[in-house]
Amino acid sequence: MTPSQKQYLVIDLKSFYASVECVERGLDPMKAKLVVADLTRTEKTICLAVSPALRALGVPGRCRVFEIPKNLTYEVAPPRMALYVERSADVYSVYLKYIAPEDIHVYSIDEAFIDVTPYLSLYGCTARELGEKIRADVAKTTGIPATCGLGPNLYLAKIALDITAKHSPNFFGELDEESYKLKLWNHKPLTDFWHIGAGIQKRLAAMNIHTMGQLAMAPTEPLYKEFGVDAEILIDHAWGIEPTTIADIKSYKSQSHSVSTAQVFDHNRDTEGARLIFKEMVEALTLELVTQKLVCSSIGIYIGYSATEVQMEELRQTGDYRSWRRHIPSSSGTKKLSYPTNSRDELMAEVLSFFDERVIPSESVHRVGLTFGNTREETGPGIQTSLFQDNTVLEKERQRQDTINAIKKKFGKNSLLKAMDLLPEATARQRNAQIGGHRSGEETNEA
């Protein structure tokens, strides 16, 4: 490493949810056969985590319960999202023993990027040694094993984690630009590389590009024609280049914001049942807008319908859920509002009208989503409301929403419910006891 060269560490907690459940049960996370899944849902429910021992036997990390081979014996743990959030915070506390917050970028609940460059002289060690020390402390403190990647930029550190470390006996990968070219320019498939999904891989294949080496050597003009400005990122990554730093990420402020929610039903709903769920989602999101003192100027809805029996039989035979799902019908759309608002009554009317316009009444609904887009501060510059709005009515509604928020914050989300939330098809009570759409593990406390 040259004096000016950065060193980035990426730490990924191995099969995090499964590892937490193993530790809670006194099991070895690397040896126990365990999956985290909510069996109260359908057989198509996704396993939120699969332990390393099961993955070593060929079970995919994000499979569905019915896809696990019947001849395997394993334990099923129901999701406890509140516990996982708590353990993630415990791990972050370990990072803070060694690194300042401004040099840590939390990428997800189980993964973090760390700029270790300023700390090597402080601790008198190499980047690899510091990474090993932090990883060992995480394991000692929480019992959770981790995989590490190390590189001179965020991209190479991530690739060292995703590809190199997973083929290393000690689960620690290191790459620089030269070793990246040497080891991975001929690596297949391209979808193993960060930010390259099946769609991009298919478009590159149509250009006869199947490896990073071929991408690096390809003429740039066709790439820019096909991918636009994103071609620059692809080309940089093919050469192992990534100029973005953690400081850049910390200082970035998105120009466009939104709040959203989505649900996948455990049993299909008819049109009226789905309409009820949209009402509940409007209630939840408008409270979120009011809490954050935001207004929105657009709405977006998504309605995904259920599969036919013929399609279900095809799935059972092929097991290819991802390609199968592309053939399932759906309705979606966005609508610009006449003026920015966070009024519950106004947004309810807009969303239900848009739902009635877009829904296919003859279809059973399996999943829904709602987004309030282009959010901004309600008192920010450029905010113009309608000349026909009754400010007295709006102020009374605001006071009502503030009161509801205060009660829910003090006594729990289920402390105050509307009559519609008690209907059989409603999901608000159940979802109020969830985190990220999954069981929190504390349902009995509030549900």
Identify the function of each model-found stretch.
Residues 20, 326-447:
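Acidic, metal-coordinating catalytic segment for phosphate/diphosphate chemistry
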Residues 129-188:
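Long, highly charged, low-complexity intrinsically disordered interaction regions
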Residues 107-111, 151-154, 294-298, 363-367:
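Short Gly/Ser/Thr- and Asp/Glu-enriched loop/turn motifs at secondary-structure junctions
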Residues 20-23, 46-50, 156-164, 228, ...:
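Short acidic, glycine/serine/threonine-rich loops at helix termini
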Residues 114-135, 208:
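Catalytic palm subdomain of template-directed nucleic-acid polymerases
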Residues 1-109, 113, 238:
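Residues that scaffold, gate, or flank divalent-cation-dependent active/transport sites
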Residues 3, 10, 202-365:
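DNA-contacting surface of Y-family translesion DNA polymerases
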